[in-house]
Amino acid sequence: MSEYTVQDYKFGQPRWCPGCGDHSFLGALHKAMSEIGIAPHNIAVISGIGCSSRLPYYMNTYGFHTIHGRAAAIATGAKVANPDLTIWQISGDGDGLAIGGNHFIHAVRRNIDLNMILLNNRIYGLTKGQYSPTSARGFVSKSSPYGTVEDPFRPAELCFGARGRFFARCVATDMSAAVGCLKAAAQHKGASVVEVLQNCVIFNNGTHDSIYTKEGRAKNAIYLEHGKPMIFGENREYGLMQEGFGLKVVKIGENGITEQDILVHDAHCKDTTLHLKLALMEGPDFPIALGVIRDVEDVTYNDAVHAQVEEVKGQKKYHSFTELLETNETWEIK
């Protein structure tokens, strides 16, 4: 049992709009950290720019509110320099996938041991309502008054395309599931991407309405758990089966279908094919997948860098710059 409580991680008074999903997520992060039990002074929360990027101010840990889109780059440097530090990187969909998109995919590709949280409300909130890389085609905003004419990024596709080893998804208002995803991300060694679906009550209210309430999730979402059959519905009456190279929804009890026929979720499968199909499911034909979709272990960038440094040091006469300066072959200029 952890020696820390939620209060040990709280700091300051959050200054977000009433009803903003950031409030719910902050509570989930405080709770997850208290259950994980890592001391606050061993944690750094690093963010970019945006509404969600104010989060480090409300954490009683080390924090760094950095520059637009560069949270992943700065978090990378911090982790490589101090591998014992637990790092939570916080970005919004605009900050993380537009100006920060390149940093995002390369941090994932390199498999740096970061907990990368993407708070996705499908809008630029801090700059007052422009469409973001995750806004739907046709979305009307201040920067697209006649509707966007482009398709959005889907974070799971970016993650898997960058050889991502961990991807989870939760809803900001679902405290229990969000805490579970955050704890799983922290336990995973490597780049852990958690997409948090949240609401912006001012500029994009209702963007995740189909699953934002408990009743909505019962009808329109599926909670994935490793080793368990993929069953969903208000009465757990539906399941997922494979059909060719795709998936199909079936009703348990019809046409002789039983729970034994339902696909069992394997989050640890190295192949991304099924994980991607699950992550891209959308209504009304399919439920939206929540929970840990992918969790595969692999060597991390930071471990590989430090192993390489030690190997090279073993082959050299001098093991550090300080040792080099302290040899007899130095002089003083007066």
Predicted features along the sequence, with ranges:
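Flexible, low-complexity linker and terminal segments
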Residues: S2, F11-G12, I202-K334
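Short coil/turn connectors at secondary-structure junctions
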Residues: G12, A39-I43, A81-I87, R109-N115, ...
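Glycine-rich beta-alpha junction loops
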Residues: I49-C51, N121-I123, D174, L197-I202, ...
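Short beta-strand segments
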Residues: I46-G48, I90-S91, N115-N120, E195-L197, ...
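Thiamine diphosphate
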Residues: C51-G125
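Active-site diphosphate/adenylate-binding microenvironment
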Residues: V6-I67
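Conserved thiamine diphosphate
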Residues: E3, D84, S132-A185
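ATP/pyrophosphate-binding catalytic subdomain of soluble kinases
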Residues: F166-Y223
